[in-house]
């Protein structure tokens, strides 16, 4: 199995995750989208030195993965390429902010180290929450929720078509890669001299597939907007869940819960 086929399999695995049945899957897409967006906005709003406040925000995705019965390591495996890039964003902070803001015993910790860790946690937690939404909600349900929020139909259609056509593009790339390997069995990968013709052929093949797909969509009544069918019945607990989560998220932002809990047991 070449890399294009592996990517296609992983992409289709997201649809399989979204098709599972759990209390989290049965919540309405709009409520999950609302909570996820609120969680991301609140998480990134923490001060760069508020590491204890940011750390509390890990509870939402962790509880969400437990309720949805999706292992947490699945998230880290799927996002194994993106997470190191997110963590790398704050690597230079210790070199620019060298002021000591915390002492652990006799060892001083600079503000750059604190802000680096805070930024890393923000990125990881937001990715975990976003993956939780994608793993428990199909792309059709996400787009339907966006339309309920009056997001322009052009954007929702573009999002849905892009997501669906990526799988088609990967299939075409896998076919071409296999054909190239049959013609050059002893060669590892595509030689640099063939990159131009390979990409050009991939472009032509993808344009042909796109034309065929669009014509078939028009034959089925597509006129610039998708009419989303009602998915699985939503749980009655959808909006109580959303309101409860929103209240807890805002509470965690307004009050430093670790400090409050520490004061109770001091």
Describe the residue ranges of each PLM region.
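Transmembrane alpha-helix interface motif
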Residues: 1-68, 171-266
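Juxtamembrane/interface alpha-helical elements of multi-pass membrane proteins
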Residues: 78-185
């Amino acid at each position: 199995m070449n890399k294009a086929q592996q990517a296609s399999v992983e992409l289709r695995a997201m649809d399989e995750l979204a098709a599972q049945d759990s209390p989290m899957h049965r919540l309405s897409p709009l409520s999950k989208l609302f909570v996820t967006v609120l969680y991301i906005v609140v998480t990134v709003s923490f001060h760069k030195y508020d590491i204890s406040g940011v750390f509390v925000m890990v509870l939402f995705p962790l509880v969400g993965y437990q309720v949805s019965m999706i292992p947490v390591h699945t998230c880290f495996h799927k996002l194994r390429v993106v997470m190191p890039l997110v963590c790398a964003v704050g690597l230079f902070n210790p070199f620019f902010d060298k002021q000591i803001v915390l002492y652990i015993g006799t060892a001083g910790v600079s503000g750059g180290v604190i802000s680096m860790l805070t930024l890393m946690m923000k990125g990881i937690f937001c990715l975990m929450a976003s993956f939780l939404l994608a793993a428990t909600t199909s792309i059709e349900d996400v787009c339907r929720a966006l339309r309920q929020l009056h997001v322009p139909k052009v954007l929702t259609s573009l999002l849905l078509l892009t997501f669906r056509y990526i799988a088609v593009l990967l299939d075409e790339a896998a076919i071409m890669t296999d054909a190239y390997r049959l013609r050059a069995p002893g060669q590892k990968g595509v030689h640099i001299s063939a990159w131009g013709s390979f990409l050009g052929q991939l472009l032509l093949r993808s344009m042909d597939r796109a034309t065929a797909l669009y014509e078939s969509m028009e034959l089925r009544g597509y006129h610039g907007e998708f009419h989303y069918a009602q998915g699985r019945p939503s749980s009655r607990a959808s909006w109580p869940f959303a309101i409860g989560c929103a209240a807890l998220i805002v509470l965690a932002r307004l009050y430093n819960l670790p400090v409050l809990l520490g004061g109770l047991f001091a």
